Amino acid sequence: MDTRLINIGFGNIVAAGRVVAIVSPESAPIKRIISDARERGQLIDATYGRRTRAVIITDSGHVILSAIQPETVANRFLTAKPGLSEETE
């Protein structure tokens, strides 16, 4: 079984097959999704204290915060090969 892995910054990696959406954190509905995930204990903050620039939503309901742009994450998602994405932060 080949799993594509996506580098989301600072050495953090996500399984590409589990990603449902990659969105910007600016809108009120996305802020509400982040808040709800925090309350459920399903929020993963991978920003290392930096500004959140991308919100990754998984099929398991987990919400992952990343400090890199959604376009960058999406590009890595589209170009990822099985195993670890060679892009590094």
Curated annotation (Swiss-Prot):
Q: Which domain of life is it from?
A: Bacteria
**UniProt xrefs under InterPro entries:** RemA-like
Where exactly are the transmembrane stretches of this chain?
none
Q: Which Pfam families match?
A: RemA-like
- Disulfide linkages recorded for this protein, renumbered to the chain, are none
Q: What family is it from? A: Belongs to the RemA family.
Which HAMAP family did the record assign?
RemA
* NCBIfam families for this protein: MtxBflmRegRemA (NF046064), PRK04323.1 (NF003315)
Name the chain's protein. Answer: Putative regulatory protein CYB_0055
Which species is this record about? Synechococcus sp. (strain JA-2-3B'a(2-13)) (Cyanobacteria bacterium Yellowstone B-Prime)
